Design a protein with these regions (language model features):
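Sec-dependent N-terminal signal peptides
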Residues: 4-13
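Subset of outer-membrane beta-barrel
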Residues: 20-336
Length: 336
């Protein structure tokens, strides 16, 4: 019964062409470039590599929702006198969902330029040209015209015409990002972004339904007392895309295991953090983030609270993130 309920829900979403397949991560604050091109290059170090995996609805479907992503960003043309830089990044995503194996592939390039608007306060504007493709398989789906009165006969014509074109479509995202360092212990960030400025076609059936533009507001910070090993990091994100909207808010408690070097200037701080977040009306999730100098590993688990929780027993999905940061000045010093 649970699988039937889920299949009906997935089928309705599929037919209406409103399956907004924009990837989203619970630990959105760990990779801000993926939600806002304006945040490209805002990290300690010179090069940042990020990979992520998210699995949802495994408890009610043999074909759960899986998202895999990878990204790299860096900053060039750095001017230390005014703290300006040009940020460059690339992102790749693969998303598969449901019995139809609805697949979305995305590749985009992030470009931004950051300027200092006051001492230790920076503002950046970014754009993100994007290419994506979306396709699905009809073989595992059943339709109303295949219902015989007691069962579905997949040998019957389904009466639907699926668009099988796998060519890439072009789109553009944009965003504005602010980062402020209040002192050595405290910092804040805030951003707004608009995705799908070109509103490309979204439906896989005959029709002219386009993808809604997506508006996102996000912010956060990190705060601690001087000399304290404990910090807290509140974060929030809100987005609206057509009739869909979501608000996530929560906090990470960060414990410092090792401080940054005061002599090399390299960010080799090691921390462990535990967080709890609420996605209003949808899920509660917890996070664990381990940061050991250049390497970071994050894990989160969603507990479903929406109407679908009757079928899921509250089991939403797991997420894993891996991040690696490179400091070229440290590498050069080590080679001397």
């Amino acid at each position: 019964m649970r699988k039937l309920a889920f299949s009906i829900l997935a089928l309705i979403i599929f037919i209406n062409g409103q399956a907004q397949q924009d990837r989203h991560y619970s630990m959105f604050y760990a990779a801000p470039m993926t939600i806002n091109p304006g945040a490209t290059g805002f990290f300690p170090g010179d090069i940042q590599v990020f990979t992520g995996f998210k699995n949802q609805w495994k408890s009610i479907s043999s074909n759960p929702y899986n998202t895999i992503s990878a990204s790299l960003d860096t900053k060039v043309m750095k001017n230390k006198s005014n703290n300006s830089f040009l940020g460059l990044g690339v992102n790749f995503y693969n998303d598969k969902s449901g019995d139809s194996q609805l697949t979305t592939n995305i590749a985009n390039i992030s470009i931004n330029y950051a300027i200092e608007i006051a001492d230790n306060h920076q503002l950046a504007l970014g754009v993100q040209p994007s290419f994506f493709q979306r396709f699905a398989s009809m073989e595992s789906l059943t339709w109303d015209q295949q219902w015989t009165g007691s069962t579905f006969d997949t040998n019957l014509e389904n009466g639907e015409t699926l668009i099988t074109d796998k060519s890439f479509q072009f789109d553009i995202n944009s965003g504005l990002y602010y980062f402020g360092k209040l002192n050595n212990q405290n910092s804040i960030n805030f951003g707004v972004s608009v995705a799908h400025l070109l509103t490309p076609q979204n439906t896989l059936l005959n029709g002219n339904e386009n993808l809604y533009q997506k508006y996102t507001i996000h912010g956060g910070g990190e705060f601690s007392k001087n000399g304290s090993k404990l910090a807290f990091s509140p974060n929030l994100i809100y987005f609206k895309q057509g009739p869909n909207q979501s608000l996530s808010i929560g906090n990470d408690f960060i414990y410092s295991l090792k401080e940054s070097s005061k002599y090399t200037g390299y960010y080799d701080k090691s921390t462990i953090s535990l967080g709890s977040y609420l996605r209003i009306g949808d899920a509660f999730y917890t996070t664990l983030f381990l940061n050991f100098a250049e390497f970071s590993l994050g894990v989160s688990y969603d507990l479903n609270m929406s109407g679908l929780s009757v079928a899921t027993d509250g089991r939403g999905g797991m997420e894993m993130l891996l991040r690696y940061r490179i400091n070229l000045s440290k590498s050069a010093a080590a080679s001397l």
